[in-house]
């Protein structure tokens, strides 16, 4: 999975897909009451990027629904995963539950259209810190209460704050989540980051019977040398400002026979058995 990073304006979707991404990450900004308003990162952000691009969240969902719906004129078949980077750290933890309700309802109304949409992308909920786990509870409660619990099959969980992996596991246990879990490891492209935690996540992913990590990705990679390092370690995905660079690295002799781009037929919740 090549995840285009910070794809917050509607016109950027095609831009990143044209560069080779098969997944996109966009930032969800909330008001003080936990209501999702816009797709927007804000300052500061990655080096060399404009941080201020934005869209109305519901309008963004309306567009991305078309881009991921078979037979729609806007369909881009390669786009199979949507990562929602939830900016919960900007609001009170007491509002995390309300935020989860709101995002679930907006996805129901504007993406899935309560069963009337054929939009097919998988959804990854990126939670910044384990203290905001009530967002996940609320999201699942809302799908159940609204009568659309089946959409849980399309939704995965990912904690992005580089916290202790055992602490993350404990929170997942509290929530009763034992599947459909990704684990991110990374830092803004402005800085270097070691591989200790990334290696630990990969080791847990590959441990037989360990159900709290199905996929691991590294972010935000812009240098080919770091992309190569991550691929050698065996990541499932890379988040990048430059998907075209990832494509070029994947075509190199060292990687061409070991990796390929994920398609809709690849289940993002299953561990890869090479």
UniProtKB/Swiss-Prot annotation:
Gene3D superfamilies reported in the protein's UniProt record: Phosphatidylinositol (PI) phosphodiesterase (3.20.20.190)
Signal peptide positions (record): none
Keyword Manganese appears in the UniProt entry: no
Gene Ontology process terms (BP): killing of cells of another organism; lipid catabolic process
Binding positions (Mg(2+)): 25, 27, 85
Active-site feature positions: 5, 41
Keywords (A to Z) from UniProt: Cytolysis, Dermonecrotic toxin, Disulfide bond, Hemolysis, Lipid degradation, Lipid metabolism, Lyase, Magnesium, Metal-binding, Secreted, Toxin
Tissue-specificity statement: Expressed by the venom gland.
Cofactor(s) the record lists: Mg(2+)
Main localization of the protein described in the UniProt heading: secreted
Protein name: Dermonecrotic toxin SdSicTox-betaIIB1bxiii
Cofactor comment text: Binds 1 Mg(2+) ion per subunit.
Family of this protein: Belongs to the arthropod phospholipase D family. Class II subfamily.
């Amino acid at each position: 999975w090549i995840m285009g990073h910070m794809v917050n304006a509607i016109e950027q979707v095609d831009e990143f897909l044209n560069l080779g991404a098969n997944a996109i990450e966009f930032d969800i900004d909330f008001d003080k009451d936990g209501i999702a308003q816009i797709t927007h990162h804000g300052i500061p952000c990655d080096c060399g990027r404009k941080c201020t691009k934005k869209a109305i969240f519901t309008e963004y969902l309306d567009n991305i629904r078309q881009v991921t719906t078979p037979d729609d004129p806007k369909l881009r078949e390669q786009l199979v995963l949507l990562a929602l980077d939830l900016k919960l750290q900007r609001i009170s933890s007491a509002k995390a539950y309300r935020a989860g309700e709101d995002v679930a309802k907006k996805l129901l109304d504007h993406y899935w259209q309560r069963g009337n949409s054929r939009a097919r992308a998988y959804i990854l909920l990126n939670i910044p810190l384990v203290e905001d786990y009530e967002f996940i509870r609320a999201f699942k409660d809302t799908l159940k209460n609204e009568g659309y619990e089946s959409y849980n099959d399309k939704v995965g969980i990912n904690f992005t704050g580089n916290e202790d992996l055992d602490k993350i596991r404990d929170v997942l246990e509290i929530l009763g989540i034992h599947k459909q879990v990704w684990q991110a490891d990374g830092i803004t492209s402005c800085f270097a980051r070691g591989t200790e935690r990334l290696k630990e996540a990969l080791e847990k992913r590959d441990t037989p019977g360990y159900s709290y990590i199905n996929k691991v990705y590294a972010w935000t990679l812009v240098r080919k040398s770091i992309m190569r390092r991550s691929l050698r370690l065996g990541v499932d995905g890379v988040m990048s400002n430059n998907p075209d660079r990832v494509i070029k690295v994947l075509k190199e002799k060292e990687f061409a026979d070991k990796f390929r781009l994920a398609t809709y037929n690849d289940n993002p919740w299953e561990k890869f058995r090479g």
